[in-house]
Amino acid sequence: MLRLDLQFFASKKGVGSTKNGRDSQSKRLGAKRADGQMVTGGSILYRQRGTKIYPGVNVGRGGDDTLYAKVDGVVRFERLGRDRKQVSVYPVAQEA
């Protein structure tokens, strides 16, 4: 006697889910002005989270730790000791 062994396979593949596949938008942090560059008062110099760079002369710190120029002048990035950096804005002398 002949025996038939029939097997049925799934005609549709099971659809799995993934926990990956998304990312947050970049926050565009970092330096916005270079050392030696001329800036006007209110210009954003550095966007950061926390105090990676500290405010120096004529530089203010916003609520989100953004550093901005308080006066017109030239940007200077400087070292404070071994492990700290600061950014300052020095006014340019006007020739009369």
Curated annotation (Swiss-Prot):
HAMAP family hit by this protein: Ribosomal_bL27 (MF_00539)
Residues excised as propeptide: 1-9
UniProt-recorded name of the protein: Large ribosomal subunit protein bL27
Single Gene Ontology BP annotation: translation
Post-translational modification: The N-terminus is cleaved by ribosomal processing cysteine protease Prp.
Gene3D superfamilies: 2.40.50.100
Annotated keywords: Ribonucleoprotein, Ribosomal protein
GO molecular function: structural constituent of ribosome
Alphabetical list of InterPro entries matching this protein: Ribosomal_bL27 (IPR001684), Ribosomal_bL27_CS (IPR018261)
Family under the similarity heading: Belongs to the bacterial ribosomal protein bL27 family.
Disordered as annotated region, ranges: 14-35
Annotated GO CC locations: cytosolic large ribosomal subunit
Organism lineage string: Bacteria, Bacillati, Bacillota, Bacilli, Bacillales
A family per Pfam: Ribosomal_L27
